[in-house]
C-alpha cells in the first residue's frame, strides 16, 4: 500500500490538470479557481501561485528543461510562465473560444494550444510568434500533443477524427477516421511510429503514423 507524503492544499475549486517537471521536484496544478500553482514535492509547499487568467484553467505543462510552464484557460488564452520567478512571460490571445489543452515539444522550442474554436496554434517559444494555425477540424479540439521527434503535432477532436500536422509547414499530413463519436485523448508511442486515440464510446484505436 502506498504511503502518502503530502496533501497539497490551496486551490479553492476542482484541480483538473497536473504535471511533474522532469526531475520530479516540482508539480504544476491547474484549477477551476482560475489559478495554477507550483509545488515543491520535497516539502509539499506552494512555491508560486500563477494568477492572471479570467476563467478556469483547463491544462498545464512544464517544458523538458523545467524552467517554463504553460497554462491554458477557458478565458480563451494560454500563458507562458517563468517557473523560477512565477512570472507570466507572455499571453497568447489568438483563439476565439476556450483553450482546452496545451503542450510543449520535447525540445521546448515550440508549444501548441488547442481550442474549442476547432483550431490549434503552434508558437515559437523564444520569439512568441504564432508560426502556424492548424485549421481543418469541424469540432472542438480537446487534446493536442507533439511526437517525440518534434516534427508533428497530433490533435483530437469532437468531429470524431484525429489529425497529424507537420510542425514545419502546418500542413495536415494524416487524418485518422474510424471513431463513431468524440475523441478525447491521443498519444504517440516513444518511437513516434504508433498512435493511440480514445473516444467517448469507450474504445481506443491504435494507428500507424505515416510521418
Question: Can you describe what each PLM-predicted range is?
Answer:
Residues 9-15, 51-57, 93-99, 135-141, ...:
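WD40/WD-repeat beta-propeller blade N-cap
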Residues 184-211:
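Blade-level signature of beta-propeller repeat domains, shared across WD40, Kelch, NHL, RCC1
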Residues 1, 41-43, 83-86, 125-128, ...:
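Short loop/turn segments that connect beta-strands within beta-propeller blades
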Residues 3-6, 45-48, 89-90, 129-132, ...:
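A structural motif specific to WD40 beta-propellers
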Residues 26, 30, 37, 41-98, ...:
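Solenoidal tandem-repeat scaffolds enriched in leucines and small polar residues
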Residues 19-24, 61-67, 103-109, 145-150, ...:
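Loop/turn segments within WD40 beta-propeller blades
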Residues 1, 12, 23, 29-33, ...:
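Conserved strand-to-loop turn within each blade of WD40 beta-propeller repeats
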Residues 18, 30, 36-40, 60, ...:
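WD40-repeat beta-propellers
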Amino acid at each position: 500500500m502506498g504511503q502518502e507524503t503530502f496533501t497539497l492544499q490551496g486551490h479553492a475549486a476542482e484541480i483538473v490538470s497536473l504535471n511533474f517537471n522532469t526531475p520530479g521536484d516540482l508539480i504544476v496544478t491547474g484549477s477551476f479557481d482560475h489559478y495554477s500553482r507550483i509545488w515543491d514535492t520535497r516539502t509539499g509547499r506552494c512555491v508560486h501561485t500563477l494568477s492572471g487568467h479570467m476563467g478556469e484553467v483547463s491544462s498545464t505543462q512544464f517544458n523538458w528543461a523545467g524552467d517554463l510552464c504553460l497554462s491554458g484557460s477557458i478565458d480563451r488564452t494560454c500563458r507562458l510562465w517563468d517557473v523560477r520567478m512565477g512570472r507570466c512571460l507572455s499571453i497568447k490571445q489568438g483563439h476565439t473560444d476556450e483553450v482546452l489543452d496545451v503542450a510543449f515539444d520535447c525540445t521546448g522550442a515550440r508549444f501548441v494550444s488547442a481550442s474549442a474554436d476547432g483550431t490549434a496554434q503552434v508558437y515559437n517559444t523564444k520569439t512568441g510568434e504564432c508560426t502556424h494555425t492548424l485549421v481543418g477540424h469541424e469540432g472542438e479540439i480537446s487534446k493536442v500533443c507533439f511526437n517525440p521527434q518534434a516534427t508533428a503535432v497530433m490533435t483530437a477532436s469532437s468531429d470524431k477524427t484525429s489529425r497529424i500536422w507537420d510542425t514545419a509547414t502546418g500542413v495536415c499530413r494524416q487524418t485518422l477516421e474510424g471513431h463513431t463519436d468524440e475523441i478525447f485523448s491521443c498519444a504517440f508511442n516513444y518511437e513516434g511510429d504508433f498512435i493511440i486515440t480514445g473516444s467517448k464510446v469507450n474504445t481506443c484505436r491504435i494507428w500507424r503514423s505515416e510521418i
